[in-house]
Amino acid sequence: MLDNCYYINRHYRYIGYIDERTLQWIEKDLAFVPKDHLVFVSMHIPSSSTKELEFNALLPDETSNASSLYDLLKGYEAHLLTGHTHNNGNVVFNDSLMEHNTAAVCGTFWKADICTDGTPAGYGVYEVDGNKLTWRYKSAGYPIEHQFRAYPVGVSEDYPEYILANVWNCLLYTSPSP
């Protein structure tokens, strides 16, 4: 678990940043990890900002020096486990690097049991079997099979002729890859 909330003043203003000491520690630690092992890195703020995971223009939504972390993870199959956005999404950067940005167990800051992207409050479930990873989102108060909501034609003013679905354990692909 990395602390990438880097405070820049006394008024709780912070940016997403991994300090040099932590990067050096990761590099030394990875020297003992075989390249054929899965690597997981957990941190609060996402490594990269995507439109789909956009949070709040007033708060940092990416780690400013994430490329340094990506460089250290080259050669490994790596998964970044992040939060902060109160949205849910899985971003595939390339064949060996993926970020799982998991919605919040508190929903929208404990004010609603639904997150800002419509995902119910909940948490990620990750299962590792050797080098095989499976994951899914577990909505609080619902069975594990509860993975989306569908809305009938006519519900949306913007898309009145469409059936809409809010799927909260989807994959997003981004380029260029880190």
What do these predicted regions represent?
Residues 57-156:
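Conserved beta-sheet core of the metallophosphoesterase superfamily
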